[in-house]
């Protein structure tokens, strides 16, 4: 799952960082796991923010299975006051046994955030079908166009038991002010027949910006999600760090969430703002396995340095390192602001090859337009590879 954000507090140039207490927490009744239709162990839950301040939170999930322990973490989208944020982790390493969930850990820091102004339409168009899937509409109630929108929700049984976290099948490219767009959600097949209703609908958006710098005479690509302006990026091979000029014109602190290729570091990042070391949130994306490093930038002009890169890493100049299966299919099929090649698509899907016939792209475009789940499309492409059509 790609991580989607909306917007983070700087105190004396340090991050106000907490281990979650009663105000930001995961209720026991909203935290569980099951084996999904692919036979992999899935853990779902929801973080509640009962504080009066918006927060950016990191969730760490740990599962014991026999003599083995598995742990994953993720930085979630910002959570507004009195709101929930659903999440889901997949553990492909766990396909059997009797997994035991440990108590989840939640760390967070307070932040500021501009409203997304995307509202779910709670009317007769919000419909659940007998097979468990749901369709509905969201409306842009703001004054500016919003791009790359996803909707998250929790599903429940008729006994009000939480069953799973779900999200819309495909990212909505954009919604202009006053317009609406349809979204479709499919629960996992193993629990679909038990679904009685959906709750906690949360829209989110990814407006990350691609950046690059020279490292070892190669172009090193990374990205950042922030309304803070970052310029003059430079990689220093002596300190294995990237420096930036940061400009926050807003008279309040906002967060920056950087994403780096997984092989570029072991995760031991250090962040300095104006020479002062701060404590960032650090996690590895559950789908792409890329690193996320998030922290706040206060009002005004600042010098930022991110250190902790692996000196032995050689940038592979992959401009689209951050793509997961869904975003790769969208880009390849022409539903994005950029397109990728057949070989890049197949690489992201884990398929060896470099050629996909044009008629397959047309078919995939049709399937995406009609909200066919991404897993189904990937399986079809893999079948075409086995049949010798994809080469």
Where are these regions (language model features)?
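Secretory targeting signatures
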Residues: 1-27, 59-61, 136, 271, ...
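Asparagine-centered strand-capping/turn motif at beta-strand->loop junctions
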Residues: 47-51, 138-143, 246-248
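Short acidic/proline- and small/hydrophobic-mixed sequence motifs that coincide with surface turns
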Residues: 52-57, 145-148, 162-164
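Terminal connector regions
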Residues: 76, 91-133, 165, 171, ...
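Short proline/glycine- and polar residue-rich coil/turn motifs
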Residues: 77-84, 172-180, 283-288, 296-298
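C-terminal beta-strand-rich structural cap/linker in extracellular carbohydrate-active enzymes
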Residues: 92-98, 191-194, 285-313
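Surface-exposed beta-strand/loop patches in extracellular or lumenal glycoproteins
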Residues: 247-267
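Acidic, Ser/Pro/Thr-rich low-complexity regulatory regions
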Residues: 313-391
């Amino acid at each position: 799952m790609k991580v989607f954000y909306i917007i983070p507090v700087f105190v004396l140039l340090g991050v106000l960082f907490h281990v979650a207490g009663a105000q930001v927490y995961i209720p026991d009744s909203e935290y569980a796991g099951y084996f999904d239709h692919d036979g992999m162990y899935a853990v779902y839950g929801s973080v509640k923010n009962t504080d009066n301040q918006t927060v950016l939170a990191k969730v760490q999930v740990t599962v014991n299975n026999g003599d083995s322990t598995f742990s994953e973490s993720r930085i979630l989208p910002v959570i507004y006051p009195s709101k929930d944020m659903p999440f889901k982790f997949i553990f492909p390493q766990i396909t059997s046994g009797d997994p035991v969930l440990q108590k989840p850990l939640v760390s967070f820091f307070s932040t500021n955030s501009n409203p997304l102004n995307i509202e779910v339409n709670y009317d007769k168009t919000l419909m659940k079908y007998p097979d468990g899937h749901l369709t509905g509409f969201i409306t842009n109630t703001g004054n500016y166009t919003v791009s790359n929108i996803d909707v998250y929700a929790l599903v429940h049984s008729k006994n009000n038991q939480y069953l799973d976290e779900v999200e819309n099948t495909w990212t909505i490219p954009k919604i202009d002010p006053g317009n609406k767009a349809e979204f479709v959600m499919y629960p996992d097949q193993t629990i679909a027949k038990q679904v009685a209703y959906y709750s906690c609908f949360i829209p989110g958006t990814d407006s990350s910006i691609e950046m690059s710098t020279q490292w070892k005479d190669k172009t090193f690509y990374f990205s950042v999600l922030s309304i803070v302006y970052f310029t003059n990026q430079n990689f220093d091979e002596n300190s294995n760090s990237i420096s930036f000029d940061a400009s926050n014109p807003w008279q309040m602190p906002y967060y920056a969430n950087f994403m780096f290729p997984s092989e570029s570091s072991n995760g031991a990042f250090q962040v300095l703002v104006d020479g002062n070391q701060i404590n960032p949130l650090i996690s590895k994306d559950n789908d792409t396995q890329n690193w996320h490093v998030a922290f706040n930038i206060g009002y005004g002009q600042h010098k930022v340095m991110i250190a902790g890169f692996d000196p032995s890493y050689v940038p592979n100049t992959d401009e689209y390192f951050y793509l997961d299966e869904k975003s790769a299919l969208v880009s390849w099929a022409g539903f994005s602001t950029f397109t990728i090649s057949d070989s890049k698509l197949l690489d992201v899907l884990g398929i060896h090859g470099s050629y996909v016939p044009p008629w397959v792209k047309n078919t995939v475009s049709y399937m995406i337009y009609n909200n066919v789940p991404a897993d189904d499309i990937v399986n079809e492409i893999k079948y075409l590879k086995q049949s010798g059509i994809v080469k």
